[in-house]
C-alpha cells in the first residue's frame, strides 16, 4: 500500500476528474493485457469495461435479473425489502460504469461489476455498487479476478480507496470480501442491514476528520 498522503482535496478532485474522463479505464492501466482475459479449468472469459451509455439495454436487463436471482431473497429479509424499480433505476444511472465478464465459448455475459469514481466523505474512491456472478460460474476465481482489476484501476488513477457495500445477512459475500482484504470502513453505519467495506490504497492524515465533518 502506498504511503503518499493526500491532504489537499483539490488533488483528489483532479484524480477523480481524470478517471471520469476515461471511457475505458481498464484499458489505460499498465496491466491491461493481463486483465483482458481470465481462464480457469478450461473456461475462458473476456473482460469488457464500458459506460452505461454504450451498453445495449438488454445487458442492463440481464444485470437486473442476475441481481434479482443472486440477492433478491437477501433484500426481502431486510427492513427496506427488495425494491425492483429502485434497483433498475440504479443500474441505469448515467454515471454507471460496467466491468463485464463474457464466456468466450458461449459469448454470454456471466458476471459484472457496476462502479463509479467519486469523492466520498472527503476521500477519492472507486465505489463498487454491484458484483454479481452467474451461479454456475461462482467459486471459480472470476469474482476475485474482477475485483483485482478494479483495484488496479484504483491504483492507476491514484484513488484513495475502493469502497463497497454488502448485506450483513449474506455471509458468503461478506467472507468473499474479507478474504480479499476488505475491512469495515469508518463510514459504515451500525444500525443498518448492510455494512460498508473498503480497502485503502493511499493514506490521508485527516480521513477521520473528513468523515466526522461530512457526518456533522
Sequence positions of predicted segments:
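C-terminal "cap" of GNAT-fold acetyltransferases
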Residues: 160-163, 167-175, 179-216
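Conserved acetyl-CoA-binding loop-helix of GNAT-fold acetyltransferases
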Residues: 139-152, 179
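Short acidic/polar micro-motifs centered on Gly/Asp/Asn
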Residues: 130, 151, 164-166
Amino acid at each position: 500500500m502506498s504511503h503518499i498522503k493526500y491532504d489537499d482535496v483539490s488533488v483528489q478532485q483532479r484524480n477523480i476528474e481524470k478517471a471520469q474522463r476515461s471511457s475505458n479505464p481498464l484499458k489505460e492501466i499498465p496491466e491491461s493485457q493481463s486483465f483482458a482475459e481470465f481462464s480457469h479449468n478450461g473456461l475462458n472469459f473476456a473482460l469488457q469495461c464500458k459506460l452505461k451509455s454504450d451498453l445495449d439495454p438488454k445487458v442492463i436487463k440481464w444485470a437486473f435479473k442476475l441481481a434479482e436471482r443472486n440477492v433478491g431473497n437477501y433484500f426481502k429479509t431486510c427492513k427496506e425489502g427488495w425494491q425492483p424499480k429502485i434497483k433498475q433505476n440504479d443500474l441505469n444511472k448515467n454515471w454507471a460504469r460496467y466491468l463485464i465478464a463474457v464466456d468466450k465459448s458461449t459469448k454470454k455475459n456471466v458476471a459484472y461489476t457496476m462502479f463509479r469514481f467519486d469523492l466520498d466523505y472527503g476521500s477519492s474512491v472507486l465505489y463498487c455498487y454491484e458484483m454479481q456472478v452467474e451461479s454456475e460460474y461462482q467459486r471459480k476465481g472470476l469474482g476475485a479476478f474482477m475485483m483485482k482489476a478494479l483495484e488496479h484501476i484504483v491504483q492507476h488513477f491514484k484513488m484513495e480507496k475502493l469502497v463497497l457495500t454488502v448485506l450483513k445477512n449474506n455471509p458468503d459475500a461478506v467472507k468473499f470480501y474479507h478474504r480479499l482484504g476488505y475491512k469495515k470502513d469508518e463510514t459504515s453505519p451500525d444500525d443498518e442491514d448492510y455494512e460498508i467495506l473498503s480497502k485503502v490504497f493511499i493514506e490521508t492524515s485527516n480521513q477521520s476528520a473528513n468523515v466526522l465533518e461530512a457526518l456533522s
